[in-house]
Every structure is written in structure tokens, then in C-alpha cells.
């Protein structure tokens, strides 16, 4: 320890003298200092070497980590540069997702578009997809296929399941299986051809009717010359030979929803000369429904029929306003007896309806002509009979009220 102290003192004195003399001196490195110490103490030299080695290892490890990090950054920069467009092309701006692009992609027609007959159309000529169907609706829409035929050893070696079970195959002649006895139509079996043809015919009729309604807006009404007279329509029932389309649009006539009255064409008498009635169609007393010529000519109209006749544009004298076609014609009548409201025991609604119907039929020129014809042809229609040709208005209203209650 004394030797080291003396050496340090000598070094300090040397530096002090050099600094005082103005001569620059180099700093002593730790290694030189270690050499000086090694000359004096070998244990101190070993400790210094171990410390320096550990420091060098730590520095090397840090340098390796820095190199790896720099290489990673460089590789990322190279990738970013390579992703840029080449040849001075400008990258398109960022576009947001448009849901219509997916729809456009779906609208792209594949090669198999309209190359096979639609199964639903083949069965009944109706398809829920209509024009948007991917399959052909008829041979006129059938497109040729561009798929090259492949070598298939099983071609036409088995029966077609669709053709044999259901009688229909949308592939027709292009089917890879056997269609036994297909006849003139390769899509439909011979025994199913009539049934399918009927379905197609009904579909064509339905399409024509829909097209007619869509073009005209509504079903065209028949001309006035083809429309029957209101009394003729009410006097006889509709027959199956008469199509419903010829009937005028509006409320259903009485003859189609109630007892079917028919004007007697000739007299009905039994052997004793008494008046007989035709068989009734209701399971009630026939005398309540079979009317004589007078009551038939003056059969009261229901409120619905009265409105129909009163609102018809060509009704003429069939208006419900009385003789002079004024409201006073109904209520302002003269009668030898009491008024209908005093004699009728039914409700006020039936009485009012009976009075209106009586005024309508009594004041109608057509009713008068029918009345005179009935009087001329029917011997029972006399002044002494149950109903006189010109009875009192009260009696006429009472009789009509009885029949009006049947409705």
C-alpha cells in the first residue's frame, strides 16, 4: 500500500509540474492506470479485466437489439413503398361501402341464366318472381348453353325422377336422364299433357282479364240496348243460360234473392173452376206467396228495389215521387177512407214503405197497362172480386203491407 501511495504522489507531482510549466499533458486512461497497477498488484488487474468484459458484453447486446429494431423499421418502410402505385399512377380516393354495389353484383347474369324452364311456370304458367325469374318462361325465352359436353359414361342410363314421378321435367331434351315415351313434348309426360294444357289455358284467360281491367280501369258496362227493362228483370228469375256479366252493375234484383215471382201466362183453374196456385218453392203456405194477377202487377218493392228504381237515370215514370214527380205526389193524395197510418198495425217503417210503393205502382203508367191487361184476361179480376180494378187506396196499401212484411 505504501508503494502505491508513493506512485500516485509521483504522478500527481508530475501533472502539477507540467501544468505549472504550461506543457499540456495527456490524460491517463484506466487501462494505463491498470497496467501501472498490474505491475504492482495482480489481483487488482484481474478485477478490472472482469469489469471491463462485462461492460463490453452489455454494450454488444444493446447494439444487437438496436440493429434488429432498425431492420424491422426498414422492412416496414420497404413494404409501404412497394404498396404505392407504379408508373406515377394516382391512387383512387377512399370510397365508403355502398350497399347498391352488392345488388349490382347480384344482378350480373350468370351463364346459366334462362337456360332451364321454370318449374312453377311449367306446372301452372304462374310464377311468383314474374319477370325477375332466373329461369325461362317458355321456349321463346330459353337461351342456348355454352357449356362444353363432358364425357359421361352414365349419360341416359337411368330414368328421370322428375319425369317419372311428377310427369314434368324442366330440362326437357337437355336432361341427362331418360324420358320414356315423352311423345311430342319432352317437358311434359303424355298423360299429363291435357291437364297441364288446361291450366295454361286458364292462366291465359286470367291474364287477359287482368290486362283488360288494367287497361280500361274497370269492366265496361253493356250498352243501354242490352240492358233489360227493370220490370222484366224483376218479373222472371235469372237462368243459367243468361251470363251474370249481362246483368246491370248494382244491387241484386229481388228475383235472385227472394221468392221468384213469375207473371202467369194463362189462367190456372182446377176442375171446379176455383183458382189454383203454382207449387211454392218455400216450405210455407203457398197461398202466402202465390199472387194473383192484380197483386202480381202491384207487387210491392223492397226499400232497396225502390231506391234502385228511383235512382235509375232512365226510369222515367218509375220515380218514387208520385204522379206529378214531386214530393207532394206521395203524401198529398186524396182518399175516400182513412189514411194508411190509421189502418196499418205494423211499424211506421213498413207503413211508409207501403205508402211509397203504393203511390209508385198506382201512379205508374206501366202498372196501369199491366192492370188493364190482367183485367181483360183474368175473369177473377172483376169489380165484385176480392180486389176491384180501382180499389181504395187504403185497401191497396194494406194488402201491400202484408206482402211487404214477408221481406
Curated annotation (Swiss-Prot):
Changing residue 238 to A does what?
Severely reduced phosphorylation by mbk-2
Which biological processes are named by the entry's GO terms? embryonic pattern specification; establishment of chromosome localization; meiotic nuclear membrane disassembly; negative regulation of meiotic cell cycle process involved in oocyte maturation; negative regulation of ovulation; negative regulation of translation; oocyte growth; oocyte maturation
Q: Looking at the record, which segments are called Disordered?
A: 1-39
Compositionally skewed regions (Basic and acidic residues) per UniProt: 7-17
Share the record's PTM remark: Phosphorylation by mbk-2 and by gsk-3 are required for its rapid degradation following meiosis II.
Q: Where in the sequence is Phosphoserine found?
A: 302
- Subcellular localization: Cytoplasm; Cytoplasmic granule; Nucleus
Where do the ZnF regions (C3H1-type) fall? 112-140, 154-182
* UniProt note on tissues of expression: Exclusively expressed in the hermaphrodite gonad. Expressed prior to oocyte division. Widely distributed throughout gonadal oocytes from the mitotic stage to the developing diakinesis stage. Expressed in sperm.
This protein's GO cellular component annotations are: centrosome; cytoplasm; cytoplasmic ribonucleoprotein granule; cytosol; nucleus; P granule; ribonucleoprotein complex; ribonucleoprotein granule
Give the domain of life. Answer: Eukaryota
**Keyword Lyase (UniProt):** no
Question: Phosphothreonine-modified residues are where?
Answer: 239, 339
Keywords attached to this Swiss-Prot or TrEMBL record, sorted alphabetically, are:
Cytoplasm, Metal-binding, Nucleus, Phosphoprotein, Repeat, Repressor, Ribonucleoprotein, RNA-binding, Translation regulation, Zinc, Zinc-finger
Where is region (Required for taf-4 binding) located? 46-80
Q: Where is the signal peptide?
A: none
- Name the consequence of residue 239 to A: Reduced phosphorylation by mbk-2. Severely reduced phosphorylation by mbk-2. Reduced phosphorylation by GSK3. Severely reduced phosphorylation by GSK3
Consequence recorded when altering residue 141 to K: In te21; sterile
Q: What does this protein do?
A: Zinc-finger RNA-binding protein that binds to 5'-UA[AU]-3' motifs in the 3'-UTR of maternal mRNAs to suppress translation in oocytes and embryos. Acts as a ribonucleoprotein particle component that may exert part of its function within cytoplasmic foci of unfertilized oocytes. Acts redundantly with oma-2 to control the temporal expression and distribution of maternal proteins and thereby promote meiotic progression, oocyte maturation, fertilization and embryonic development. Recruits the translational repressor ifet-1 to the 3'-UTR of mei-1 and zif-1 to negatively regulate their translation.
Q: How does it assemble?
A: Interacts with taf-4 (via C-terminus). Interacts with ifet-1. Component of a ribonucleoprotein particle complex that interacts with cgh-1 and car-1 in an RNA-dependent manner. Association with many proteins is dependent on the presence of RNA.
Name the chain's protein: CCCH-type zinc finger protein oma-1
Amino acid at each position: 500500500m505504501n508503494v502505491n501511495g508513493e506512485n500516485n504522489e509521483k504522478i500527481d507531482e508530475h501533472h502539477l509540474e507540467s501544468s505549472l510549466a504550461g506543457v499540456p499533458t495527456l490524460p491517463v486512461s484506466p487501462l494505463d492506470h491498470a497496467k501501472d497497477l498490474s505491475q504492482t498488484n495482480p489481483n487488482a488487474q484481474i478485477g478490472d479485466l472482469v469489469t471491463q468484459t462485462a461492460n463490453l458484453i452489455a454494450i454488444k447486446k444493446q447494439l444487437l437489439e438496436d440493429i434488429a429494431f432498425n431492420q424491422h423499421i426498414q422492412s416496414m418502410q420497404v413494404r409501404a413503398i412497394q404498396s404505392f402505385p407504379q408508373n406515377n399512377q394516382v391512387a383512387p380516393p377512399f370510397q365508403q361501402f355502398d350497399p347498391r354495389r352488392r345488388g349490382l353484383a347480384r344482378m350480373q347474369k350468370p351463364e346459366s341464366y334462362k337456360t332451364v324452364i321454370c318449374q312453377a311456370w311449367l306446372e301452372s304458367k304462374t310464377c311468383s318472381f314474374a319477370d325477375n325469374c332466373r329461369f325461362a318462361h317458355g321456349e321463346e325465352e330459353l337461351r342456348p348453353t355454352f357449356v362444353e359436353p363432358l364425357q359421361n359414361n352414365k349419360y341416359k342410363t337411368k330414368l328421370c325422377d322428375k319425369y317419372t314421378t311428377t310427369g314434368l321435367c324442366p330440362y326437357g331434351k337437355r336432361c341427362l336422364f331418360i324420358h320414356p315415351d315423352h311423345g311430342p313434348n319432352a317437358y311434359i309426360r303424355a298423360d299429363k299433357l291435357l291437364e297441364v294444357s288446361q291450366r295454361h289455358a286458364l292462366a291465359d284467360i286470367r291474364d287477359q282479364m287482368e290486362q283488360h281491367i288494367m287497361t280500361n280501369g274497370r269492366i265496361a258496362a253493356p250498352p243501354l240496348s242490352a240492358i233489360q227493362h227493370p220490370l222484366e228483370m224483376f218479373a222472371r228469375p235469372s237462368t243459367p243460360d243468361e251470363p251474370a256479366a249481362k246483368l246491370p252493375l248494382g244491387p241484386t234484383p229481388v228475383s235472385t234473392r227472394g221468392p221468384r215471382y213469375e207473371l202467369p201466362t194463362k189462367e190456372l183453374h182446377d176442375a171446379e173452376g176455383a183458382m189454383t196456385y203454382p207449387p211454392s218453392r218455400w216450405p210455407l203456405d203457398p197461398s202466402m206467396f202465390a199472387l194473383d194477377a192484380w197483386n202480381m202487377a202491384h207487387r210491392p218493392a223492397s226499400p232497396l228495389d225502390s231506391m234502385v228504381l228511383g235512382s235509375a237515370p232512365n226510369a222515367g215514370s218509375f220515380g218514387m215521387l208520385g204522379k206529378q214527380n214531386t214530393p207532394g205526389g206521395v203524401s198529398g193524395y186524396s182518399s175516400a177512407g182513412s189514411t194508411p197510418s190509421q189502418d196499418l198495425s205494423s211499424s211506421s217503417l213498413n207503413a211508409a214503405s207501403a205508402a211509397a210503393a203504393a203511390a209508385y205502382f198506382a201512379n205508374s203508367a206501366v202498372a196501369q197497362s199491366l192492370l188493364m191487361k190482367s183485367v181483360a184476361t183474368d175473369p177473377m179480376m172483376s169489380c165484385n172480386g176480392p180486389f176491384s180494378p180501382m180499389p181504395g187506396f187504403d185497401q191497396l196499401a194494406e194488402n201491400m203491407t202484408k206482402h211487404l212484411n214477408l221481406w
